UniProtKB/Swiss-Prot annotation:
Gene Ontology cellular component terms for the protein in this record: cell outer membrane; pore complex
Subcellular localization, as worded in the UniProt entry: Cell outer membrane
Descriptive protein name: Cryptic outer membrane porin BglH
UniProt organism field: Escherichia coli (strain K12)
Regions that span the bilayer: none
Family indicated by similarity: Belongs to the porin LamB (TC 1.B.3) family.
Length: 538
């Protein structure tokens, strides 16, 4: 473009000379003609230099005056360090057309970040996700995870879990908005190089559509600010992140719900969802589908004092059984369905220097109580790996949890996850009906903060659980884990900042295994593993 401008300019400047030369050709001598040509050439060169300088100014960023400094060797330091593809601080956008009576520029400045957000909001599409992946090896062959839900995740997980969410705004006018949301989740195997979905040897490669729903705002006169949704979606999950299970979880095949409905000082989440289960017979070989429905109600974000909020929650699951399904339970050895519930409360305290702690109290009965008694994954499911079975007799279980992180000075941070549980007369998936249990699990993760991007620390985990069956026989399960790690981060928070890359060395030992009989490779009761793992969400 610049060369073309130069050539055009030269032609325009030489054109008058050509006309004048033709008109004077008959009266000028050769010397006079040469003199005129030299003069015109000098003028052309001057004009070309002017255009060249103007072009340079267009592409040279403005700089501020500064003194020239020297480095330790006495050389002048470059006051204008080079950078590639530097982003402008702002962009100009055209405002709405002004009336004749209005004054001022029709353009205004907008930061590049705001402009990017404007474009994203205008398109109405977002892509969010999460995944983890990594490499590890162990002292006795292939590394194995054990009791992640009690001993902690660092250096103890070898899966490639992912969540991918697509959201598209389809309407946004007159105070009403409609969005379509689809979420996929699953696992990509970390053992073999091929990871075809459906080639599920070892249970590693699988995927599902966990969410597919429409969410709206502004359609309910009594709750215009709330999110009203219909489709395959459940109530929001609340996770004990260091243990990789949920204190609040309501899975759904389909449902209808309302979130963030402002009522009084807090907000209400309410969901009515369907979650059918496979009801098994006592041989665990035959099954029948039972339609169940769940009501999940939460009153959240209730202010208590400075930076403290309270949530109160309740959940009830009931079955809508056909006559043939009831007959199978009465006469053909299928387990009876028993309605199940969970109630509780949680308190979240944020700290002035960053960090938080969340305390929760939960009580449940029947099949949800059975899942309170699991030492590995302890989310409040109504089934065990999707199967409903067991003689549930109305027994109850209680769970107290603490999780959070706190900064100690400028260079230390510690995260925690502590759970105490007990239950009476529950169905245990390890020790059967009319079981009692008591368990405690504790994981702490202190680290030294080198800077915003580096931390070095240790994750220490210990748990012990005792079950007592209907005959008062006792079964114990316990173990501990020590993980040394260094992480590359983008912020100092352990629980709320990602991406994160970890390098770790882990020693894990099973002290007692009377509930599951677990062993590592070569029938060992311990394992030393090293590896690296990446975890990211966006």
């Amino acid at each position: 473009m610049f060369r073309r401008n130069l050539i055009t300019s030269a032609i325009l400047l030489m054109a008058p000379l050509a006309f004048s030369a033709q008109s004077l050709a008959e009266s000028l001598t050769v010397e006079q003609r040469l003199e005129l040509l030299e003069k015109a050439l000098r003028e052309t060169q001057s004009e070309l230099k002017k255009y060249k300088d103007e072009e340079k100014k267009k592409y040279t960023p403005a700089t501020v005056n500064r003194s020239v400094s020297t480095n330790d060797q006495g050389y002048a330091a470059n006051p204008f360090p080079t950078s590639s593809a530097a982003k402008p601080d702002a962009v100009l956008v055209k405002n709405e057309e002004k009336n004749a009576s209005e004054t001022g520029s029709i353009y205004s400045s907008m930061t590049l970040k705001d402009f990017s957000k404007f474009v994203k909001d205008e398109i109405g599409f977002s892509y969010n996700g999460y995944y983890r992946s990594g490499w590890g090896t162990a002292s006795h062959g292939s590394p194995k995870s054990w009791a992640i839900g009690s001993l902690g995740r660092f250096g103890n997980e070898y899966s490639g879990w992912f969540d991918l969410q697509l959201k598209q705004r389809v309407y946004n006018e007159n105070g009403k908005r409609v969005d379509a949301v689809v979420m996929m989740d699953g696992n990509v195997g970390q053992q073999y190089s091929t990871g075809w979905f459906g080639d599920n040897a070892g249970g590693e490669n699988y995927m599902q559509f966990s969410d597919m729903y429409v969410t709206t705002k502004g359609f309910l006169p009594f709750a215009p600010e709330a999110d009203f949704w219909v489709g395959k979606h459940g109530a929001p999950k609340i996770e004990i992140q260091m243990l990789d299970w949920k204190t609040q979880r309501t899975d759904a095949a389909a449902g209808v719900g309302l979130e963030n409905w402002k009522v009084g000082p807090g907000k209400i989440d309410i969901a009515l969802v369907r979650e059918d289960v496979d009801d098994y017979d006592r041989s665990l070989q035959n099954k029948q589908q039972i339609n169940t429905n769940t009501i999940d109600l939460r009153y959240k974000d209730i202010p208590l004092w400075d930076k403290a909020t309270l949530m109160v929650s309740g959940r009830y699951v009931t079955a809508n059984e056909s006559a043939s399904e009831k007959d199978n339970q009465d006469n053909n050895g299928y387990y009876d369905w028993k309605d199940t519930w969970m109630f509780g409360t949680s308190l979240t305290q944020k700290f002035d220097k960053g960090g938080f702690n969340e305390f929760s109290f939960l009580v449940a009965n029947n099949s949800i109580a059975s899942n309170f008694g699991r030492y590995a994954g302890a989310s409040p499911f109504t089934t065990f790996n999707g199967r409903y079975y067991g003689d549930h007799t109305g027994g109850t279980a209680v769970r107290l949890t603490s999780q959070g992180e706190a900064y100690i000075g400028d260079h230390f941070i510690v995260a925690n996850a502590i759970v105490y549980s007990f239950g009476n007369d529950i169905y245990s998936y390890e020790t059967g009906a009319h079981s009692d249990f008591e368990s405690i699990r504790a994981v702490v993760r202190p680290a030294y903060i080198w800077d915003q991007y580096n931390q070095t620390g240790v994750e220490l985990g210990y748990f012990t659980q005792q079950n007592k069956d209907a005959n008062s026989n006792k079964f114990n399960e316990s173990g501990y884990k020590t993980t040394l790690f260094h992480t590359f981060k983008v912020n100092t928070s352990m629980l709320t900042s990602r991406p994160e890359i970890r390098f770790y060395a882990t020693y894990i030992k099973a002290l007692e295994n009377e509930l599951d009989g677990f062993t590592f490779e070569d029938n060992k009761d311990d394992q030393f593993a090293v590896g690296a793992q990446a975890e990211i969400w966006w």
